[in-house]
C-alpha cells in the first residue's frame, strides 16, 4: 500500500515538474551544469549504471550512498536558506514602491513652483517693455511718414519737371526722370484713394501719353511713310526718344519699329515689283544683294540710334524674308508654267545660302514671337546642309561600303532661319520630283544599254563577288536626291521622292538584275551510258559557262548590297522626313524584291550543278548492277559527279566570298536537291546483286564524304562546314546507306529481314519497302507476304522493334553474308 502511494506521489511530482523545451533551454543557458542529475532527460537506470559499471564496484555502494546523502543534505540546506531569504521580499518591494511615489510627488511640486516663477517673470518683462514697444511703433510710423512725404515731394517735383521737359523735347533727361517717377509712383498704389495722389498719378499717365504721341510724330517727321528718307544720319533727339520708348507702353516701341522697317523696305517693294524683270527667279540674287547692302547701310547710319536689345538689323532682315516669301509665292503662282527644274533649284540654292548667311549673322531672338516656328519645324539634327557637303569621291567610297552616311562630324546647331523664305518653293517641288523621275528613268535605260554594249563583267577571282558598278551609281544618285530634297522640304515632297525611289529600285531589280540572269535549257534524253560518262574538263554538260556563273554570283552580290543599302535608305528617309509622315516610309516591298533576286540566283546555281550531275545519276540507274562481279574503286558516275562539283563549287565560292551566308545557302539547297534525287535514282538500280549492292554502298559513302567537304572543296583554306549543312548531308546520305544495307541483307527468314528494315530506316513505310524488294529482284508473290508481315509489325513501338531487331544484319545472318559486310566496311575505312 505504501509503495503504491509513493509511486503515485512520484508520478504527480514528475507531472508538476514537466517543463517545456523552451523553458528547459533557458534554464540551461542561465545555470549551466555538467551534473547528469540536472539534465532534462535524466535516466535513473543509466545513472546507476555509470556509478556501478561492474559487479565488483557494488562493494563500494555504502560509500556512494553516504556521498549522495551528504549532497542531499547540502541541497536541503541551500533550499531552506533561499526560502528564508524570500520571506521578506514582498514587504521590501511595497516599501520601495511607496518611497518612489513620494519622490514623484515631490518632483511634481518643484516643477509647479518653477512654472509659477516663470509666469511671474514673463509678466514683469511685459510691464517693463510696454513703454518701449510704444516708442518703437511711434518711431516706425514716423519713419514711414517721413519717407512717404519725401516720395510725395519727389513725385510732385518729378511730375512738374517731366511735363516741362516733355514740352521742350528733352528726351535724354526725360528717360532718366520718367523711370524714377514710375518707381516712386509704385509706392503710392495703396494711397490712390487720396485725391491729391490720384491727381498726380493721372498727370503721369497724361505725360506718358503725350510723350508717346510726340515721339511717334518725331519719327514720322524723320522717316515719313511716303517719300524718300531725309539725308544725313539720325539725330540725338531720336536716339534719346528710343530710350524713352523703352519705358513707355510696349505698343509705342512696336509702332516705332514697324514704321521704321516699313519705310526702310519701301524701296525694295518698288524695285522688285511683280512686273519688274528683276523680280523673277533667275535674278533672285539681286534681292539678297539688296538687303545685304541695306543692312550695311543701317549699321553705318542708324546702328547707334536704336538700343542694342531692339535687334533692329535682325528685325529688318526677318521682315524682308516675310515680304520676299510672299512676293515669290505670288509671282510663282502667276508664272508657274515658266518654272523649270534648273531655275527652281538655282533659286532654292541661293535662298538657302541666304538663310545660312542670316544664321551666321543673327541669333534669331526676334523669331520667338513670329511665324517662323509655325512655318517650319524640321526634325532636330537632320538637316544635311548643316554638314559639310561630301565630295563625289567620298560619296562613291561610302556607297561601296554600303553606307549612305559619311563619317559623322559634330553637327552644327539648328538654323533658326531655315525655311523662312525657302518655304514658298514647296508647292512647286513637283517640278523637281518630275525631273528626278525622268532622270532616274534615263539612268536605268543607260544602265541597260551599257550592260548590253559592254556585256557581263569579266571573271576575276581576285575581285570575286563585286557588285555591278551601276548599283553604286544608282545609290550615289539616290543620296544626292535625298539630301537635295530634304533641303527643299521634309514634308510631302519627300514622300513623293520616296515613291520615285521605290519605282526605280524595282525597275533596277527587274531590268538590270533579274533581266540579265542566264536562262536554263533542258538537255535531250536518249543518251547511252558511255556518252553520259564521257565528261572531262571543258565538256558541255554544265549548262552555264564560267562567265555566266560569275555573272550570276555578281548579280547575287549586287542584290545583297541593294537589300542592305535599301534598308539603310529607308532609315535615312525616316530620319529626314517630318515625324508625322514617318509611317508612310516603307521600302519592305523593294527589299523583298531583292530577296527574290537572291533566291532566284541561288536556285539557278543549284539547278546548273544539279543538271550537270543528272547524266551521271542516269548512268548509275542504267548500269547492270546484277552483273557486277567484284567490288573495286569508286564507279565512273561518282567520278563524274565529283568532277562537276570541283568545277563549279570553287568558282561559286570564290565569287561569293563577300557573301558567305549565301554560299552556305547554295550548299544547303544543293544538298536538299541532290540527295533526294540520288536516292530516287538509287531505287531505279534493279535488280542488284550482293556485290553490286556493296559497290553502290561504297559509291554512296564516297559521295557522302564529298558532300560533307563541299563548302571547302579544292580550297587552300579548309573551313569546318556549317553544322546545319552537315546535319542535312549526314541525314540524307545515311538514309541511302541504310537502304543499301537492307538490300544487302538476306530476305530469309522474313521476320528478321522486316525487323532489320524497321530498325535501319526510321521513316519506314510500305512504299519504300516495296522499292527495296524490287531492287533485290524478288517476285511479286514473294513480296506480298513480306508486305503483309511489315504491315503487321509497323505499329510496334520503336523499343520493341529494336529489341526484336537484336537479330541484326550481322548476328542472325549466315556467316558468309556477315563476312561480306565486314569486308566492305574494312574497304571503306582503308579508303578513308
Curated annotation (Swiss-Prot):
Residues 97-138 form a coiled coil. The modification Phosphoserine is found at residues 377, 580. Residues 398-412 have a biased composition (Basic and acidic residues). Residues 799-809 have a biased composition (Low complexity). The modification N6-acetyllysine is found at residues 110, 360. Its main location: Golgi. The modification Phosphothreonine is found at residue 391. It is found in: Golgi apparatus, trans-Golgi network membrane; Endosome membrane; Recycling endosome. Residues 373-412, 794-822 are annotated as: Disordered. GO terms for biological process: endocytic recycling; lysosomal transport; protein targeting to lysosome; retrograde transport, endosome to Golgi; vesicle-mediated cholesterol transport. Keywords: Acetylation, Coiled coil, Disease variant, Endosome, Epilepsy, Golgi apparatus, Intellectual disability, Membrane, Neurodegeneration, Phosphoprotein, Protein transport, Transport. Belongs to the VPS53 family. Acts as a component of the GARP complex that is involved in retrograde transport from early and late endosomes to the trans-Golgi network (TGN). The GARP complex is required for the maintenance of the cycling of mannose 6-phosphate receptors between the TGN and endosomes, this cycling is necessary for proper lysosomal sorting of acid hydrolases such as CTSD. Acts as a component of the EARP complex that is involved in endocytic recycling. The EARP complex associates with Rab4-positive endosomes and promotes recycling of internalized transferrin receptor (TFRC) to the plasma membrane. It is linked to Pontocerebellar hypoplasia 2E: An autosomal recessive neurodegenerative disorder characterized by progressive cerebello-cerebral atrophy, profound intellectual disability, progressive microcephaly, spasticity, and early-onset epilepsy. This is Vacuolar protein sorting-associated protein 53 homolog. It comes from Homo sapiens (Human). The lineage of its organism: Eukaryota, Metazoa, Chordata, Craniata, Vertebrata. The gene is VPS53.
